[in-house]
Amino acid sequence: MNILVTFDNNYLEHALNMLLSLKRYNDNLTIHIIYDDLSIESINKLKEFFEKNNIGNLKLYYQQSDKDVSVIETDYITKSCYLRLYAPYIIEGVDRILYLDPDIICQGTLEGLYNMDLDSKPIAACENMLREEVKYLRELMLEHILMPKDAIYVNSGVLLIDIDKYKESLTIDQLNNFLRDKSQFLDYHDQDALNFLFYKKIKFIDNTYNYQINAVDSGKEDLNKIIIHYSESTKPWKKDYPWPNKAIPYYEFLKYKREN
């Protein structure tokens, strides 16, 4: 399987944790990492981690962010998040690739997801999940990027991408121009861009492969999902995380921290 990950120095340890969980259930991995802000120290640590844990093949791509694209950054959204949108123009010799956010945990094989029929669509993704008390935001999320109220807004944390179909649907010039002209209106950053640019071109998949646990009301979480995604700004490695670590599937993070 060809897996795509993008992150910066701040998310290195969390990405390594995700890869540990991925490797536990999946073999024959080639991990493609596109970056614009990884130090030499981080890259060396990454290479040592791959060798020590026998993760798979590692391919690194340095891609400098477009200086003309002024994106809004937060403590968990940086320019590196936008690199996933450029992956099909950077990675060669691959027909499809599975993008995974570094803030997820894998709890099973991803073969079924990776090999699914995309029905001639360039992307497969899961609907963005919202807690009951904030579901009114759904229409606002669609409205601010000029999408119909009945459209399905997807989460960009797990994306199965057909490389050729993606490039047929969107040229790199179109992507550059869109981000250059519209980035200030993208409240949800690269996720907004993906939804707007690929409207009606996305195959929708079950949230088994992208269970956004922070969007579930407390006490109603279903932890028997293949991918648990700690989306939004609340993360289990932060001190203010509302649930005890032992009660959630994030033990690999603690294991990695203890052993390294």
Model-identified regions with their sequence ranges:
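A glycosyltransferase accessory/donor-loop signature
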Residues: 1, 5-7, 156, 161-260
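A structural signal for isolated positions on well-ordered beta-strands in alpha/beta enzyme cores
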Residues: 2-4, 30-32, 59, 98, ...
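Short, acidic, metal-binding catalytic loop of nucleotide-sugar glycosyltransferases
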Residues: 21-29
